[in-house]
Amino acid sequence: MLPSTISYRIYKNALFFAALFGAVQAQKVGTSKAEVHPSMAWQTCAADGTCTTKNGKVVIDANWRWVHDVKGYTNCYTGNTWNAELCPDNESCAENCALEGADYAATYGATTSGNALSLKFVTQSQQKNIGSRLYMMKDDNTYETFKLLNQEFTFDVDVSNLPCGLNGALYFVSMDADGGLSRYTGNEAGAKYGTGYCDSQCPRDLKFINGLANVEGWTPSSSDANAGNGGHGSCCAEMDIWEANSISTAYTPHPCDTPGQAMCNGDSCGGTYSSDRYGGTCDPDGCDFNSYRQGNKSFYGPGMTVDTKKKMTVVTQFLTNDGTATGTLSEIKRFYVQDGKVIANSESTWPNLGGNSLTNDFCKAQKTVFGDMDTFSKHGGMEGMGAALAEGMVLVMSLWDDHNSNMLWLDSNSPTTGTSTTPGVARGSCDISSGDPKDLEANHPDASVVYSNIKVGPIGSTFNSGGSNPGGSTTTTKPATSTTTTKATTTATTNTTGPTGTGVAQPWAQCGGIGYSGPTQCAAPYTCTKQNDYYSQCL
């Protein structure tokens, strides 16, 4: 997610054939262009490392689409202003406006190939498009929902072409699987057209929420000619797996008092879009792990331990207190695989703030050491985030720039008035003058990010199960019989049969616990470490 004003925009005119008009979230469906979802394969893995391909699809958020009069082709929204005749109020606007299909490659710079999705920053066709936000689909009318408790989520990413100020974000939100189609009678478009977005910032820049327009109370943005804030926002829990460019990265859980999507009113929404940031029902800050912010300035970046000049595999594990999918979320772990080596997440170097994973204790200590308000605990902490993961969340893949704070919260000093030696201020090596969207759009229009090779499965099942890019048919891949692993600066080559075989347990795989029947010996130099009675892991 996106902790600042989302800057996905389309520059529009009034010509029908351009098919690139105001970026809005419509609820009715037009007939000018058929909606065809690009295919994107992903995999589910079993405990033995065998993975099965799912034939998924992606859909672009409705906020990017052309929306026009249902009886013609007049824009409902142009620049950052509503058409007063078509949209005098929320209900009339929803009734009068229709949403069209998308030309993914030519208009939005979004292309797929096998299991890969490539997003381009600036796409110039008849008009100019900035960034994009897409969702994984189960079928043409339904978002895929992922339940990640006691699971790990793995994907490959190439951020080599993302400079300071850009954010290639892959994350989960508690959207309705049908995009709100069944809950809200005013919504006739649904997930097929990318409706129903929500996140922990309770965004108010959405043009339609819960089947109604957001025109009442709409204030055009003073910095973004194509955006504004309405009287309502759309709230839900958010799990940021990956927010990154080539300089910095962070992963961040954001719980809400109630995980699912709900509409909020005005400044009581809280978050980036409201005057009272902490006045809502969600945690806008979250509890983040950014290696640079935690004190290790040589871990992630060009030529560093995790080398952003190369594609990498990112593994995120969601551990529970009892080692089951019905347990309580207790820890979120991160590690990387690059050049055949497993790389442990960096350790925090600040006094009284040790560790390399997220737990309730770590998050409380971080808020104290960094002097931040502990809204993470206020809104449920790990337990609150776990409630959302248990219900199932929708996968979001995006690329954006930041009109609110130039992405300095990710890759530079924030606040800019702070001293870089003060704990928590420095988040990356980018200059505080970097990240201006106008500069990025002018000087880095060809910036891009590629997400690929998505896998989900039991702990230890996904990161050593091959890196194929399958086509449309269902296939399976088995883990390699050998792997080169790295823990800190030590490298070892070991043979393994996978976590439930009779040989040696893989690095970071399960190696013990109640009900576990796999190998209990870890590959050197790893040690089987008890996490709880139900789960031990090779660390």
Curated annotation (Swiss-Prot):
Any one GO CC term of the record: extracellular region
Region annotated Disordered, chain positions: 462-504
UniProt keyword annotations, A-Z: Carbohydrate metabolism, Cellulose degradation, Disulfide bond, Glycoprotein, Glycosidase, Hydrolase, Polysaccharide degradation, Secreted, Signal
Entry-listed glycosylation sites: N90, N296, N495
Active site positions, chain numbering: E238 (nucleophile), E243 (proton donor)
EC number(s) per entry: 3.2.1.91
Subcellular location: Secreted
Disulfide links within the chain: C511-C528, C522-C538
Top-level taxon: Eukaryota
Biased composition annotated in UniProt, kind: Low complexity: 462-503
GO function terms (MF aspect): cellulose 1,4-beta-cellobiosidase activity; cellulose binding
GO terms classed as biological process: cellulose catabolic process
Catalytic activities: Hydrolysis of (1->4)-beta-D-glucosidic linkages in cellulose and cellotetraose, releasing cellobiose from the non-reducing ends of the chains
Pfam families per the UniProt record, alphabetical: CBM_1, Glyco_hydro_7
Region of interest: Thr-rich linker: 462-503
Principal place of residence: secreted
CDD domains: GH7_CBH_EG
CBM1 domain segment(s): 503-539
Region ranges (Catalytic): 27-461
Coiled coil segments of this chain: none
Annotated family: Belongs to the glycosyl hydrolase 7 (cellulase C) family.
Function: The biological conversion of cellulose to glucose generally requires three types of hydrolytic enzymes: (1) Endoglucanases which cut internal beta-1,4-glucosidic bonds; (2) Exocellobiohydrolases that cut the disaccharide cellobiose from the non-reducing end of the cellulose polymer chain; (3) Beta-1,4-glucosidases which hydrolyze the cellobiose and other short cello-oligosaccharides to glucose.
Record's protein name: Probable 1,4-beta-D-glucan cellobiohydrolase B
Origin species: Aspergillus clavatus (strain ATCC 1007 / CBS 513.65 / DSM 816 / NCTC 3887 / NRRL 1 / QM 1276 / 107)
